[in-house]
Regions:
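DNA-binding patch around the recognition helix
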Residues: 2-10, 31, 43-48, 65-125
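A structural micro-motif at secondary-structure boundaries
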Residues: 3-4, 15-37, 107, 111-115, ...
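Short amphipathic alpha-helical recognition elements used for nucleic-acid or partner binding
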Residues: 28-60
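Catalytic-center loop of serine/cysteine hydrolases
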Residues: 151-166, 195-209, 213-350, 359, ...
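Structural motif corresponding to the intra-repeat A-B loop/turn of tetratricopeptide repeats
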Residues: 342, 376, 412, 446, ...
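Amphipathic alpha-helical segments of tetratricopeptide repeats
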Residues: 357, 390-391, 427, 460-461, ...
């Protein structure tokens, strides 16, 4: 199907691209503030007609009352961009007493037309673009492809662009910050403020690529940077590898005394990380009340040293418009940003909230506040601030505007729109690794891993150190983690090795953290724990307490899988303390849920239920549906053990609704597996099989070897009830070998219990007793109360079948007393049935007849249809005395 052509407006040597909000003179973009561009569009669309001043002002500021001077300023900026003045106007004519008129004839054209106004060089560029477009077979709606020094003006396939002509990589600059020579802490905020403003100034015009402030902060934590005005050759070489930066700006500032009128002296040193030398020293002095002027002077001098053209007056106006409107807002924003980058999200959030109050219309304060809320686990509040940032982004540069919009779309989440925005950024700036990684992340989150991998393959073609950045490998790992754990593990290891080589310790920690999770999912717990601990130690050294808390959780999870509940509980409590100190409510909720799980496994059902009930509203407070869904898995298990089967089913269905909404197949697998248990206990075997098989299919789909084995064990238990004990025996034996190899003691004991039951159903009492003997050591170390009860009942039945009925009865009576004490009501019915079975074996059938009748009736009243049926069948097999 043919795509609709894009429309442009042309007049004189100019062309307007309305979709991209861009004015071009020939091929060169002409910088305009957003309001000046809107003014131009209104006048152009009313070409040769007078537009009254009031109409213009209402269109430009529909919700605000502004002075006419604001309109005059926009007209001034517009005329300056068009190369005219009020006295010598060719385009924007003043009609005294009325308004303004666009005096030139405007031509509306489509991108398929060959404009008569395009110069010869432009015609050649268009021809190339059209040839490439015809090979690619489709257009990208709404995106303009911008190569360094050459604006193409048409859309075509990004992969073809890179295949035909690799992007020109701009020189990169990292502003490392400035020492505060005043010695006064209250002036420290100027370091961040000056760094951010200078980065914005140098980025204007897009001739240089600026390293992000976040990456600079990370590098300063990772590398042993001295507190000096210049860096050694060795440190410069490390920065080149660590940051991918060709140039760095470093230096110091001092605030002169009040007698000097509150002036600031800024001393800068421009150093080349490749040649490993200082190439320029710059000193400027200006008013602290007008830091922009100080930065403009410094930026102009640095541009001159680098041979980069100066910022135009129009660009200067645009940059000034993108800054906070007052000193207090700038101070609070800078301090909040610095806190965020030091992993102090709670303090950063408070400062950024004050910054927003001081200047509610400053978009970047809202964007930073969104990041702070995300770090604290408040996704809904993060979304609200991201939306405000986007709504207020009109005064920002085009690049900044797209970055703000991309974040808004991603956290909404509207991943398809985020893909569109990040693709636009990456197309405009193909040498910017950050934008490529953002695009791949959005594609991955949108469920398009193949697209993400294609984007990442393109990034790998960038020259080193960009193309060898370990973050590319981490994104590859994320894109394939659901389908190929082995390859994901290899990518994570490669990322870690690259991080070690470049000195990027925090990237090593990220790689190890991801590797730990993968090893946990593979059931390789003994390998996972030291990897988690390595990540934790790196985070601790960097002061990243959230990273520490997360790794404590990961290690605790592995300990749970190993059956070491005491150590797991200790680790979860330590993690909870870290999250509380951070003010991370989502982390606190998760830790409460984990603690509830440990208390539950330890047999304290009442306390566990209280912790679950406390965690659920916290999850809902931060709107963490994924965390809530995982909690509901454990809550459903607890409800089943308390013989609250209908409640357990309802809980599972609630969790499934949450997990399906986010397409979380991992949690869906757990919930389906848990749902099968109450259904089986109710005697609904066909329904139970259906959900167990769905669980297994999901776990196989996402390559979860460990949890898939758990699903097979549940199906084996069900097979016994269906009369297929031989099949159950084989499955249980296979699972035991797998669990033993993965050091999964709890799962091994579960499989052993099911194997014993299968052997007893087959009449293989001796084999069942042998299994009990072999698993004695594992059983003695078990700390998982529900699994321990399940195994103990099966082991006692095996003892009874082998003739040791007195010992078996004694064990079962002890088990029953424990179950009554702890509240494991569902197991009480199983234990009573096993005791009745011993009495029948011992020839005391008449004595147990009444107990079986009572057991069947009570089980049925609690919904335990399977036990009720077994008790009734056992009672019917007892001969009636005549």
């Amino acid at each position: 199907m043919a795509m609709e052509n894009k429309r442009f407006y042309e007049f004189g040597p100019f062309r307007i691209d309305p979709e991209e909000h861009q004015l071009l003179r020939g091929e060169e973009p002409v910088p305009l503030t957003p309001k000046a561009f809107e003014t131009l569009m209104i006048l152009v669309r009313s070409s040769e007609r007078v537009v009254p001043k009031d109409d213009l002002m209402k269109s430009l500021w529909p919700d605000s009352f502004v002075e006419e001077a604001n309109l005059s300023q926009n007209i001034f900026i517009l005329r300056k961009a068009l190369g005219e003045t009020a006295q010598n106007a060719r385009y924007v004519m003043t009609v005294p007493g009325r308004g303004y008129r666009f005096a030139q004839k405007v031509r509306e054209v489509s991108d398929g037309e060959a404009s008569l106004l395009v110069q010869s060089q432009s015609i050649h560029t268009v021809t190339i673009a059209e040839k490439r477009r015809s090979r690619s077979g489709f257009l990208w709606a709404g995106l303009a492809v911008l190569a360094v020094g050459c604006w193409v003006g048409y859309q075509f396939n990004l992969r073809r662009i890179h295949a035909a002509a690799p992007p020109v990589v701009r020189r990169s600059v990292a502003v490392l910050g400035f020492r505060n020579l005043t010695g006064r802490p209250e002036e420290s905020w100027l370091s961040t403020a000056l760094s951010e403003m200078l980065s914005t100034e140098l980025a204007t015009g897009n001739k240089l690529r600026l390293v992000s402030g976040e990456d600079v902060a990370r590098s300063k934590l990772e590398l042993p940077l001295t507190d000096a005005d210049s860096l050694s050759r060795d440190t410069l070489a490390r920065l080149h590898t660590n940051l991918g930066s060709d140039l760095i700006v470093i230096g110091s500032y001092t605030v002169l005394d009040e007698k000097s009128g509150g002036r600031v002296r800024l001393d800068l040193h421009l150093q080349d990380t490749v040649a490993q030398e200082t190439i320029a020293d710059v000193a400027v002095v200006g008013s602290e009340a007008d830091l922009f002027e100080v930065v403009t002077q410094a930026g102009s001098r640095l541009r001159e040293k680098l041979g980069v053209e100066a910022v135009s007056e129009v660009e200067e106006v645009s940059v000034r418009a993108s800054l906070p409107s007052n000193r207090e807002a700038a101070r609070l924003y800078s301090e909040g940003l610095a806190r965020l980058r030091r992993y102090e999200a709670l303090e950063g959030r408070e400062l950024l909230e004050q910054s927003v109050a001081a200047d509610p219309k400053y978009a970047l304060s809202h964007a930073a506040l969104s990041a702070a809320w995300t770090a604290l686990g408040y996704d809904a509040k993060a979304r609200a601030e991201a939306a405000k940032a986007y709504a207020l982004s009109g005064n920002l540069s085009r690049e900044e505007r797209l970055v703000v919009e991309g974040n808004d779309r991603f956290v909404t989440p509207d991943y398809e729109k985020a893909i569109e925005i990040y693709r636009a950024l990456y197309t405009l700036f193909p040498d910017n690794l950050e934008y490529g990684l953002d695009l791949a992340k959005a594609q991955d989150f949108a469920g398009r891993p193949s697209d993400a991998l294609s984007t990442l393959a393109t990034l790998q073609k960038l020259p080193a150190p960009l193309g060898t950045d370990p973050r590319i490998d981490l994104r590859i790992s994320s894109a394939i983690s659901d389908s190929d754990h082995a390859k994901a593990l290899a990518a994570e290891e490669q990322a870690a090795q690259k991080g070690l080589a470049s000195g990027s310790k925090l990237l090593v920690a990220r790689a190890r953290r991801s590797e730990c999770a993968t090893l946990n999912n593979l059931g390789r717990l003994n390998e996972a724990i030291p990897v988690c601990e390595e990540a934790m130690h790196i985070y601790a050294a960097a002061g990243d307490h959230e990273g520490v808390a997360t790794e404590l959780n990961d290690i605790a999870y592995a300990r749970v899988q190993q059956g070491n509940l005491t150590e797991a509980k200790k680790l979860f409590e330590e993690a909870a303390q870290n999250f509380r100190e951070l003010g991370n409510d989502d982390g606190v909720a998760s830790t409460l849920a984990n603690l509830a799980g440990i208390v539950y496994l330890d047999g304290n059902l009442a306390e566990a239920k209280k912790l679950f009930d406390e965690a659920i509203p916290r999850y809902r407070k931060v709107e963490d549906s994924e965390g809530e869904a995982l909690l509901l898995v454990n809550l459903a298990a607890l409800q089943t053990d308390r013989a609250e089967l209908r409640a357990a089913e309802h809980t599972c269905q609630q969790g499934l609704a949450l997990a399906q909404r986010t397409n979380d197949k991992h949690t869906q697998g757990y919930l389906l597996a848990e749902l099968g248990d109450p259904l089986m206990r109710e005697g609904k075997l066909a329904e139970s099989r259906k959900v167990y098989e769905q669980s297994l299919a999901l776990r196989n789909e996402v390559s979860e070897k460990q949890t898939a084995a758990e699903s097979r064990i549940y199906l084996a238990e069900l097979a016994i009830e269906e009369g297929h004990a031989a099949d159950a025996e084989k499955s249980a034996r296979d699972a035991m070998v797998e669990f033993r190899g993965g050091q999964q003691a709890d799962d091994e004991l579960t499989a052993a219990a099911i194997l014993i039951e299968a052997l007893l159903a087959e009449g293989k009492a001796s084999d069942a007793k042998d299994t009990v003997d072999r698993e004695a050591d594992v059983a003695s170390k078990n700390q998982n109360r529900p699994i321990g009860l399940k195994y103990a009942i099966a082991a006692a039945r095996a003892l009874a079948a082998s003739g040791k009925m007195t010992e078996a009865k004694s064990r079962l009576e002890s088990i029953l007393a424990e179950e009554k004490k702890t509240g494991f009501q569902a197991y009480q019915f199983e234990t009573r049935l096993a005791l009745a079975e011993i009495e029948v074996r011992a020839g005391h059938a008449d004595a147990v007849r009444a107990e079986l009748v009572s057991l069947a009736r009570q089980a049925q009243s609690r919904g335990l249809g399977l036990i009720a049926r077994k008790a009734a069948e056992m009672q019917r097999r007892i001969p009636v005395k005549t």
